[in-house]
Amino acid sequence: MERKGRWKSQIIAPWFEAIFHNFLLSGDFNIEEVVSNQKSEIIRCGTLSVKHPENSASNVLAALGEHRDIVEEIIQQNLSKIQQERLRGAMSHLFTGGGKRLRAIMPRLVGDAVGYGHEGHYTLGACIEIIHNFTLVHDDIMDQDPIRRGLDAVHVAYDNATAINAGDAMLALGFEMLADSPHIQDGQLRDVVSAIGEMVRHVAEGQQEDFEFEDRVSVSEDEYISMIAGKTSAMFETCAETRAILAGADTNAVANMADWGLNLGLCFQIMDDYIDMTSDTETLGKPAGSDIVQGKRTLIAIHALESGADLPTFRKLFGTESTDTDELPVAVKELRNNGSIQYALDRAMEHHRIAHRCLDKLEQTPAVNLLRDMTDFQLVRIN
């Protein structure tokens, strides 16, 4: 609804806007026609979305495609600074495996939404993408994961020592890029560097918590949320926060966008846990429910373990590292019947709603609508 007078600065519930526009303004309506006409508008009533699910994905992917090449060129230009050939190869390795570059492009999208998007946002996005890949290189060593993005992990393609060195160099290169950029003002640089440094620290803390969870008899839901807030969500939070800083947003807007990024990241990670249980082996590239045999303390597993329910197959397989996956569908069915899988989806939806409320505080523009599509994209991944 158009916001005038006393309503101009107010937050209007999305479900009321949908009802007002589509039902109250017209004397009669056809629900099928309403649904079929929703090409870009988000209509949310609880967990119901009367929006073609492919639209969020296509809008986000189109935006990523528009900006991706620019960010990719900045990344490659900076990697070319590395004169030692083997080190440069190790640092560049994961970038040859593709990826959507969501974190790399988010700065420009947020900049457009809250103020003034400019070239500095591309540099910032490239910086965070390189630092993100540094964390992946080190994570794969610590977890001894052999594959990343369909490629041999860096420590497999090269060796452990080179991979560690490459990760360290990527972290250093990210900060060097920021300092050298002519598009980032000196007054903003301090805040940006501080935020990214804090992000890296939170990622490390989250990773350490994840390690320690493996040897714990029990992990609470609050502890799990704290862990993924550091290991996963901190990067989304910092992407949004630093973009707002470079766009010249005020303190309240910066904090609001940081909150949006945090909840986007929490939704992203919980949906990953959900998808592992509900998708198929062909899509995942691994058996559905493999988190069970790996003993991962996901929100689904925590809910199941704390429920007191029998769940014999789940409890038998949990943490066994078994390569026999024949019983996994039975364990997944137990989790579904117990409500553990639905519980995780409900929590993801909760963070999805909070993220949208953050966007409700902004002037509603095409750039903000794209951030809404990015928020919905986290849920569209289940379709």
PLM feature spans:
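A glycine/threonine-rich phosphate-anchoring loop and its flanking beta-alpha core
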Residues: 157-158, 168-184
